[in-house]
């Protein structure tokens, strides 16, 4: 009788961890920001030029971590991307999702269509109405 009780006691923490995993939403109607690594450097604010590494996927709630088809990656090219934060030079999801990050930080952004490429999409790479998932690492703030 003692052995089953010990086995159950050992399995309870594992069951709690499994139950704690929140499923990804099927649709996203607002920007989702997931802090992966808190940076310790300068905070990015509108007006700064930010230097980032990123990888972008089409959001797919059925795929592992929501990562559907990869559409672009500065990491794969080995070439960081810089842009003036808040100047409208990138999609709104990027401006809003990078603001407040600190250099050295990493975030996962789940960007709804209205903060991405909307109903027009982007060429043959991003279809109309696509939700995007982008991992961003803030390398520098100038």
What are these regions (language model features)?
Residues 2-142:
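Cross-family detector of peptidyl-prolyl cis-trans isomerase
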């Amino acid at each position: 009788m003692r052995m089953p009780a010990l086995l159950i006691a050992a399995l309870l923490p594992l069951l709690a961890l499994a139950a704690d995993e929140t499923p990804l939403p099927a649709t996203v109607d607002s920007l989702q920001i997931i802090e992966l690594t808190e940076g310790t450097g300068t905070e990015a604010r509108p007006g700064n030029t930010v230097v980032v590494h990123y990888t972008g996927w089409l959001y797919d709630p059925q795929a592992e971590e929501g990562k559907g088809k990869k559409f672009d990656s500065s990491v794969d090219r080995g070439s960081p991307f810089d842009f003036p934060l808040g100047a409208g030079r990138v999609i709104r999801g990027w401006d809003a999702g990078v603001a407040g990050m600190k250099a050295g930080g990493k975030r996962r952004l789940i960007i709804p269509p209205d903060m991405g490429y909307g109903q027009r999409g982007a060429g043959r790479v991003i279809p109309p109405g696509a939700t995007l998932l982008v991992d961003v690492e803030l390398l520098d703030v100038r």
